[in-house]
C-alpha cells in the first residue's frame, strides 16, 4: 500500500497503523449517537472496549465488566487540553463520536470550474450556464480527457482532506463520464480510493446526470443506453452500489427517471435521486415509491412527497454548500420534514461546480445557520442519518457494541463545538476499522508506533 502526502499533513498507511484494541477510557459520549450497554450518566466518564477491531462493550467506565479490565488502556480523560478548544476543567472526559459519514459527493473529476464561479458572480445563472454547454458538461469534457491514474491522483487529496476531519465512510458518484468507458473509469477510481485509504466507499452510478453532447436532442436514446448497456455492464463488474440520477428540467424527466429506476430494480440495486433542486417535478415521490435510500437537495418538495418519503424510510439529504454557492432562494422545507419524522442527513456534495467544499463540519454549521437545523439534527445528519442514506446503518454512524471500531476523539468541551467553530480543524484522534490512523491527542504510549501526531 502506498503512502500519500496530502495538504492536510496526514501521511499514513493503515497497514502500519497500530491496532486500537484495548480500553478507551475517560470519554464523553453523545447519547444520541451512542447505543450503550449500560445507561450513560452525564457526569461520569465512559469507556469503549475494542477487540479484534470491533467494539465489544460501550458504557460507564465504573461499570466496565471485569473480563475486560486487564486489557491495554488508552486513557483520554486528560488528553484534551484546556483553553480555547480544550476540555473544560472538571469535564467527565474527552469527547468521542462515531466517525463521520459524507453521504453525497462527486469526488472524482477532472479540471475545475472557477470560471463559472466568476460568471455567476457577474449574474449568470446555474441553468443558463448548463444550457450554454457549461456546468456538468464542462466537467465531463475534463474528466473524459483525464486518465484513470490522473483522476486518482486528483481525487486523493480531496478524500484525504475529508478523512483528516474524521470522515470514516463516504459516497462517491460517477456522472462526469456519460459514456461507458468514462463512467467505468470514475467508478474504478472510487474503488481504488477506498482500497488505498482503507475507508468505506459506497459508489453511486450517476450515468443519467446530464445529456452528453453526442446525444443532444436524443434524450430517450441516451436513457436506453444507460439502462440497457452502461448500468448492466458496470453492475456486472461490481462497480455499482447504488443508482442515482438527476430529475430536473435541465436534466431528465420523471418518465426517464422511472425507466432508470426500473433498470436498477431488475439488477437488485438500490436507488437515490437528485430531486427538487430547481423545481418540483415529482421526483422525490417517485423515488420513495421505489424505496430510495435518499432524495438529495429538496429545495422544492411537496407535502405528498414528504409523506411518501416518511413511509418509505427515505432519507432527506441536505446540501447547504450547493444552496449557498448557487445563492439559493428557497430552502428545503425543514419544518415539514421534521414534523413528518423524515430523517435528515447533511453532506458536502463536493463537486467542481456548485459545491467545491471539503469540510463536512462546515456543512453541518451551514445546515444549522442557513437551513435552521438544530445542533442534534446536524450531528445526526453527519453520522447516524448519513449512514442510513448509504445503507450503512448497521455498521456506521453510531457507537455501539458489535460494530467495527470507527470513532473519533475531539479536543472540545462539548459536541456543539463540532458545529460551532468555523474553519477549525481539531487535532483529533481517529480510529478507523479498528486501527489508530491519527493520534492528534497523543494517547498512544508507544511513540515509536507509526501514527501521525500533531506536527508530524
UniProtKB/Swiss-Prot annotation:
Family the UniProt entry places it in: Belongs to the metallo-dependent hydrolases superfamily. HutI family.
Superkingdom of this protein's organism: Bacteria
Task of the protein: Catalyzes the hydrolytic cleavage of the carbon-nitrogen bond in imidazolone-5-propanoate to yield N-formimidoyl-L-glutamate. It is the third step in the universal histidine degradation pathway.
Binding-site residues for N-formimidoyl-L-glutamate, renumbered to this chain: 176, 351, 353
Gene designation per UniProt: hutI
Record protein name field: Imidazolonepropionase
GO biological process: L-histidine catabolic process to glutamate and formamide; L-histidine catabolic process to glutamate and formate
Residues binding Fe(3+), per UniProt: 104, 106, 274, 349
Cofactor requirement: Zn(2+); Fe(3+)
Keyword Cytoplasm among record annotations: yes
HAMAP family reported for this sequence: HutI
Matches recorded under PANTHER family: IMIDAZOLONEPROPIONASE, IMIDAZOLONEPROPIONASE-RELATED
Residues binding Zn(2+), per UniProt: 104, 106, 274, 349
Cofactor, how bound (note): Binds 1 zinc or iron ion per subunit.
GO cellular component, one term: cytoplasm
Cellular localisation: Cytoplasm
EC main group: hydrolase
Amino acid at each position: 500500500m502506498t503512502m500519500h502526502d496530502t495538504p492536510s499533513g496526514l501521511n499514513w498507511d493503515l497497514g502500519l497503523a497500530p491496532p486500537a484494541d484495548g480500553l478507551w477510557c475517560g470519554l464523553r459520549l453523545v447519547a444520541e449517537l451512542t447505543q450503550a450497554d449500560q445507561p450513560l450518566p452525564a457526569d461520569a466518564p465512559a469507556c469503549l472496549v475494542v477487540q479484534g477491531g470491533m467494539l465489544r462493550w460501550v458504557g460507564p467506565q465504573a461499570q466496565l465488566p471485569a473480563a475486560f479490565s486487564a486489557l491495554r488502556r488508552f486513557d483520554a480523560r486528560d488528553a484534551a487540553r484546556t483553553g480555547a478548544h480544550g476540555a473544560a476543567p472538571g469535564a467527565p472526559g474527552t469527547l468521542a463520536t462515531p466517525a463521520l459519514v459524507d453521504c453525497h459527493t462527486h469526488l472524482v473529476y477532472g479540471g475545475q470550474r472557477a470560471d463559472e464561479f466568476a460568471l455567476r458572480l457577474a449574474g449568470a445563472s446555474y441553468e443558463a450556464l448548463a444550457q450554454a454547454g457549461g456546468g456538468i458538461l464542462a466537467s465531463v469534457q475534463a474528466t473524459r480527457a483525464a486518465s484513470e491514474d490522473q483522476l486518482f491522483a486528483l481525487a486523493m487529496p480531496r478524500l484525504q482532506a475529508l478523512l483528516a476531519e474524521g470522515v470514516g465512510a463516504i459516497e462517491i458518484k460517477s456522472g462526469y463520464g456519460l459514456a461507458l468507458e468514462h463512467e467505468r473509469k470514475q467508478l474504478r477510481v472510487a474503488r481504488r480510493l477506498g482500497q488505498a485509504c482503507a475507508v468505506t466507499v459506497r459508489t453511486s452510478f450517476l450515468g443519467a446526470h446530464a445529456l452528453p453532447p453526442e446525444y443532444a436532442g436524443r434524450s430517450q436514446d441516451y436513457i436506453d443506453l444507460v439502462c440497457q448497456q452502461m448500468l448492466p455492464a458496470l453492475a456486472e463488474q461490481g462497480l455499482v452500489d447504488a443508482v442515482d440520477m438527476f430529475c430536473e428540467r435541465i436534466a431528465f424527466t420523471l418518465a426517464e427517471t422511472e425507466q432508470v429506476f426500473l433498470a436498477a430494480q431488475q439488477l437488485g440495486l438500490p436507488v437515490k435521486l437528485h430531486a427538487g433542486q430547481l423545481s418540483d417535478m415529482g421526483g422525490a415521490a417517485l423515488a420513495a415509491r421505489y424505496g430510495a435510500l435518499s432524495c438529495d437537495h429538496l429545495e422544492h418538495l411537496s407535502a405528498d412527497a414528504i409523506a411518501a418519503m416518511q413511509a418509505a424510510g427515505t432519507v432527506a439529504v441536505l446540501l447547504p454548500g450547493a444552496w449557498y454557492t448557487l445563492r439559493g432562494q428557497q430552502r428545503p422545507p425543514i419544518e415539514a420534514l421534521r414534523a413528518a419524522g423524515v430523517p435528515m442527513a447533511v453532506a458536502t456534495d463536493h463537486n467542481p461546480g456548485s459545491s467545491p467544499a471539503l469540510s463536512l463540519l462546515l456543512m453541518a454549521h451551514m445546515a444549522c445557520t442557513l437551513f435552521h437545523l438544530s445542533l442534534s439534527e446536524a450531528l445526526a445528519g453527519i453520522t447516524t442519518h448519513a449512514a442510513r442514506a448509504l445503507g450503512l446503518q448497521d455498521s456506521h454512524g453510531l457507537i455501539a457494541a458489535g460494530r467495527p471500531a470507527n470513532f473519533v476523539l475531539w479536543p472540545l468541551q462539548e459536541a456543539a463545538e463540532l458545529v460551532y467553530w468555523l474553519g477549525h480543524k481539531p487535532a483529533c484522534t481517529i480510529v478507523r476499522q479498528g486501527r489508530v490512523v491519527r493520534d492528534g491527542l497523543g494517547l498512544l504510549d508507544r511513540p515509536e508506533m507509526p501514527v501521525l501526531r500533531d506536527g508530524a
